[in-house]
């Protein structure tokens, strides 16, 4: 099995062990404390539910727990910062008391990130790559925490109006390069950055598949690569219509492809199932000439 080269990175986290990226693929488990997320909305609204899910993910092998309190699915209704904080604070407090793995806050709002970081989150995952809220980059710089910069265009309620590309892979790479520069200008150290091509965000199904099929090209950005294909609707271009949980088989295929192309982190909903996929894909990498 010939796998793409995967460079190693060490991403520091204040007050705890760094993320060591490269020797094996890290698994990020998703917990949405929302009533309307496309895959698991409503399943973790209660802090005790969020805690139990996080404990199960950690026990299954999750390396990071990603907590979000606003659905960013296409067409989702925006949530104000006060409501987002009210949702995320009790969840992060409960999760941080129950698991030792790093917690990531999935938000594009500086005020939400600040509240989450104060309660134990130590990574910021921003779908807008510091574009929606100009205060988020400086906040990340101040705290010295890792940041995940995801690619999108427009806002969740109009992103598909921006899904026009002549060369989707080249343009996503160029946009991420601009995001990296935006982070630099905000004072964020390059060694703290992780990039995410944003499958399903401002991309039609075939465009997401094209990005997924060309992940090796993102190596030119020389940063750790996170991929989030989990249960996304772009898979319907290959499978036909399926419910979110029925997309786990497609997710497994996407995760395997991403790892063989050099992805460092995969973001998934079903950690218990996907951890086995990740381990087999890593075994294929280690058996190949480019491991």
Which functions belong to the PLM regions below?
Residues 2-7, 13, 22, 39-53, ...:
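Active-site-adjacent loop and "lid" segments of alpha/beta metabolic enzymes
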Residues 52-68, 261:
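Catalytic domains of carbohydrate-active enzymes, especially glycoside hydrolases
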Residues 199:
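Active-site metal-binding loops of divalent metal-dependent hydrolases
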């Amino acid at each position: 099995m010939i796998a793409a080269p995967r460079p190693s990175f060490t991403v520091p986290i204040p007050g705890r062990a760094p993320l060591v990226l490269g020797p094996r693929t890290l698994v990020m488990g998703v917990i949405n404390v929302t009533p309307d997320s496309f895959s698991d909305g409503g399943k973790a609204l209660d802090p005790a539910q969020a805690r139990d899910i996080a404990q199960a993910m950690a026990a299954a092998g999750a390396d990071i727990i990603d907590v979000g309190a606003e659905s960013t699915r296409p067409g989702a209704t925006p949530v104000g910062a006060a409501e987002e904080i009210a949702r995320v604070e009790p969840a992060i407090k409960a999760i941080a008391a129950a698991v030792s793995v790093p917690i990531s806050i999935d938000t594009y709002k500086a005020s939400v990130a600040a509240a989450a970081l104060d309660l134990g989150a130590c990574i910021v995952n921003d779908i807008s790559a510091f574009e929606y809220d100009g205060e988020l980059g400086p906040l990340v710089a101040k705290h010295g925490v890792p940041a995940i910069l995801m690619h999108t265009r427009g806002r969740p309620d109009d992103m598909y109006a921006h899904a026009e590309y002549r060369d989707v892979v080249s343009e996503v790479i160029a946009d991420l390069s601009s995001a990296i520069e935006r982070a630099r200008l905000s004072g964020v150290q390059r060694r703290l950055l992780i990039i995410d091509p944003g499958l399903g965000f401002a991309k039609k199904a075939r465009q997401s598949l094209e990005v997924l099929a060309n992940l090796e090209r993102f190596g030119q950005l020389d940063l750790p690569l996170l991929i989030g294909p989990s249960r996304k609707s772009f898979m319907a271009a290959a499978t036909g219509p399926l419910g979110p949980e029925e997309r786990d088989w497609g997710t497994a295929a996407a995760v395997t492809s991403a790892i063989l192309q050099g992805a460092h982190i995969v973001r998934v909903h079903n950690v218990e199932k996907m951890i086995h996929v990740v381990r087999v894909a890593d075994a294929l990498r280690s058996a190949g000439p480019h491991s």
